[in-house]
Amino acid sequence: GFLFSYYWDMILSTKNLRKEVSTDSGTLVILEDINLEVRKGETIAITGPSGSGKSTLLGLLAGLDDASGGEIFLNQHPLHLLNEEQRSEVRKENVGFVFQSFELLPGLTALENVMLPSELNSRKNAQELAQYYLKRVGLEERLNHYPRQLSGGEQQRVAIARAFACESKILFADEPTG
């Protein structure tokens, strides 16, 4: 019983994860021997100086990039064994993102930006979810404002509301506090 529930509570794990890139002067190791376990409901922060590989690690964990070695399991899916199309499907079903640059569409209002991922996934209650999460981040009075009409902090909160509105199993945030 314990091992079974332990395994199914695991939302993300890595074993001996490695990322390297080829350069003119040889192979550069970006990440080496990364072992990580994250259970459902846990929150973790990956910290380190600029250039230490945090964003690279996030890209690997979310299945946005291929590892050079090791294993990555995201909600029991072996990302290290999947091709890009299969990883994309796993992301669609399991992952939400808050990007460093917010990635808001300038021609859409705050409400529409938050609704978009839910609508793309044919969620019936996209508007209700978007309004709920925009209220949770204190932007209920700014629903019909475009990104250019919002401060940087407000744009960031729209991006956070969008990520939560997807109701994903795991949320990745790359420098969510700016």
What are these regions (language model features)?
Residues 11-12, 17-178:
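ABC family nucleotide-binding domain
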Residues 1-9:
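Short, Lys/Arg-enriched N-terminal segments with co-localized hydrophobic residues
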